[in-house]
């Protein structure tokens, strides 16, 4: 009940394609970073989770509410601007949340530096399947470690695991 009855944000984020989502107000910008969004914008602030959900359900009839993690990791950034996308969606916002529009929209760019880009995700490591993961780490995006060979590992899926880590510095 405490989580539901607090301010929530309805947002658009670009994680390779623009999507709609909701989060508790105090989770920004953490939520966008976790998703690997390269741009995001809060568009509605509701007093509770229910009203944010009403808006999200209405908008997901016109725009996805899912992140395609493979697209996000290959940095296949489309050139859609979240502000322009929102302008096209405003007429689809339900009447009961129209007074929740955020007056000053702020398009937030987020940068995830990589040593190099990967063209394709070739493998997703799982410590449950193989407890040994080796590779050269070239980047971190969202919840993922990205390795030179195109393999990735979702760190959030491994919460609670105890690991050992050997780090070698490569000379270039």
Description of each model-found segment:
Residues 1-172:
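Non-catalytic accessory segments flanking enzymatic or RNA/DNA-binding domains
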């Amino acid at each position: 009940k405490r989580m539901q009855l607090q301010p929530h944000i309805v947002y658009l984020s670009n994680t390779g394609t623009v999507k709609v989502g909701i989060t508790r107000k105090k989770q920004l910008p953490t939520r966008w970073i976790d998703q690997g969004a390269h741009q995001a914008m809060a568009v509605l602030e509701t007093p509770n989770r229910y009203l944010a959900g009403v808006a999200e359900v209405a908008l997901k009839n016109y725009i996805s509410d899912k992140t395609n993690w493979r697209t996000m990791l290959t940095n296949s950034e489309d050139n859609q601007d979240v502000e322009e996308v929102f302008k096209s969606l405003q007429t689809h916002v339900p009447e009961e949340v129209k007074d929740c529009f955020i007056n000053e929209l702020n398009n937030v760019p987020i940068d995830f530096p990589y040593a190099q880009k990967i063209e394709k995700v070739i493998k997703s490591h799982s410590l449950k399947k193989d407890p040994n993961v080796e590779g050269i780490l070239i980047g971190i995006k969202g919840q993922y470690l990205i390795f030179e060979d195109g393999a990735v590992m979702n760190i959030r899926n491994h919460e609670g695991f105890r690991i050992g880590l050997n780090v070698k510095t490569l000379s270039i």
